[in-house]
Each structure stands twice: as C-alpha cells, then as structure tokens.
A protein has these predicted regions:
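Short amphipathic alpha-helix that is part of the acyltransferase structural core
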Residues: 25-70, 80-100
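Conserved small/polar residues in nucleotide/adenosyl-binding loops
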Residues: 266-276
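A short acidic/small-residue loop/turn micro-motif
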Residues: 100-102, 277
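Short acidic (Asp/Glu) patches
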Residues: 61-69, 75-79, 99, 109-126
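Acyl-donor binding region in acyl/amide transferases
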Residues: 103-265
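Conserved N-terminal entry element of GNAT/NAT acetyltransferase domains
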Residues: 2-39
Length: 277
C-alpha cells in the first residue's frame, strides 16, 4: 500500500481552474462546477486522484497506489473530469469522470474503449441505438470531509451539486438521453445485504433486453425463495422500504449511489453484476 500524495497547493489548483473550464454554479451551496482533463489541468487531476484514493480506501476499496489515476484518465482521448469546487474553502468536494458516447473510440476488434469494457459485453443494439446518445459515468466520489455521515450540513448538498453538473451536460449536449456506468460494492460489504440489493435491482430494474451483460456474472448466494418471500410487492416503493429496513438490521446502509439512482430515476435499468476481473 503506497502512501497517498500530499495535497496539491490551492494556488496551483485555482490557477488551473480557469473561468473557461467552469461549467456552471451549483443550485445549492454556491459552489462551482468545472470540467477538466488530465491534459489541460494535470495538477487538478492529481488532486482528484488523491481525493479518490482517500475516499475509496475509507469505503474498503482503493487502488493501493499513491493516486487513483488510470489509463482512461490520461489516454489520448481521455475521460473528462467533472468536479465541484468550493470557492470559499478553496477545495474540491467531489467529482465524476465521464465520456460522451458519440466520442467513444473503438479498438481494432471493434470493441469500445470504455472503462467498463473489461467487465461487460455490449450488444450491437446498445452500441448502435444507445451509445451515441449516452454518457458513461465513473469514479464518482465525495471528498471524505463532505460525506454526509461525517460532515453534517457541510456535506448535505455534495451529491446534489454533482448532479447539477450532470444536468448541465444534457443542456450543452442536447442529444444525450442516457447515463450509464458501474456502481462498485466492495467485498467488505455484508454478503446477504449485497444479495438483497442485487435481487431488488434485478426484480424492479432488470435488463430484459440484455443490452449489457457481465463477463463474469456474480451469483446471488442467499436462498432465492427467501428473497422472493421478502420482496413480495409489485410496488418498487414497498419493496424499497423492506430493503432499507433489512439492510439496516445487518448494521449497514444502502450504498449512496444505489439509493440515489433508484429513488431519483423512473427509467432505470440494472445490467446485472460482474465480479472484478
């Protein structure tokens, strides 16, 4: 496990977060949203990598490296980084990385160069009818100090601020109809709680058209009959109440992104689950 790099100087960060990279102001908390790349803001990228690694290690993951930066962040046609900046504290409070579907490149085998492509197979229907109108999201994080369980009111709107940025993408790119990406659940998460979440997602949001399929499907280990009896409602809302109650009984919370996406989006698809390859 490498030691995480020291924070990047605030003056250096401010110099790279120039006005031409500012996407918009947030609806709440008076923060600022920027879009940068490794090529135009290398020091901001380092700070993002530092904050990602801290946040992911705290959740039971992380790369184990000094920064969480990979080839998709630094390649020739890199993922863009959407970051929320607190101008008062002069610090980053969270971010996503994203790639517009109509900018996706393909390798010599016709495979899309996507961060999820090593874990999932994409159908021809998805590649032709969905990808050009899609944004792939990944590496979402909220800086540890702004996570609501730790920060109280300071972190209350951190996720909302990030979503302001995603909403702005649909304005500047009006052809965007869909967002997709993977949500990670670490091995440290309670196994039965994980199975409950997966069963719930597959029941209410399953991808019946097999647009995207896992290369290494993760099997639910908990007794299926027990899960069927537990989640016995046709209503998503009623089953969600049960899920929330049962996961809390295990001493865990539903992961923030699972909670946010399922509650906020009516047209959601869960494309099964892939074990990390």
């Amino acid at each position: 496990m490498e030691e995480i790099i020291a924070p990047i100087s605030k003056e250096i960060l401010k110099a790279e977060l120039s006005e031409d990279k500012r996407l918009r102001f947030t609806n709440k908390s008076h923060n600022e949203i920027y879009v940068i790349t490794y090529q135009d803001s290398p020091n901001v990228m380092k700070e993002i990598g530092r904050l990602r690694e801290i946040a992911f290690r705290a959740a039971g993951g992380g790369t184990g490296k000094a920064m969480d930066i990979d080839e998709y962040d630094v390649m020739e046609n890199p993922y863009k980084q959407l970051v929320v900046w607190n101008p008062e504290a002069e610090e980053i409070l969270g971010g996503y990385r994203y790639l517009l579907g109509d900018e996706v490149q393909f390798d010599e085998h016709g495979k899309p160069v996507l961060a999820t492509a090593h874990m999932f197979n994409f159908s021809e229907v998805f590649l032709k009818e969905y990808l050009p109108y899609t944004v792939e999201l990944g590496r979402s994080f909220v800086t540890l100090e702004y996570q609501s369980t730790r920060a109280g009111s300071k972190g209350l709107f951190a996720l909302d601020n990030l979503w302001d940025g995603l909403g702005a993408l649909t304005v500047i790119k009006p052809n965007v109809k869909y967002f997709f990406g993977k949500m990670t659940m670490y091995p440290s998460y309670h196994r039965q709680g994980r199975d409950m979440i997966l069963y719930f997602l597959n029941k209410h949001f399953g991808d019946k058209d097999k647009l995207i399929t896992p290369m290494k499907p993760l099997e639910i280990e908990t007794d299926k009959k027990m899960l069927e009896n537990l989640f016995c409602y046709d209503s998503f809302k009623e089953d969600y109440k049960i899920l929330n109650t049962e996961v809390r009984k295990l001493g865990y919370n539903i992961p923030p992104l699972v909670n946010a996406y399922t509650v906020s989006y009516t047209h959601l698809r869960a494309h099964e689950t892939s074990a990390h390859l």
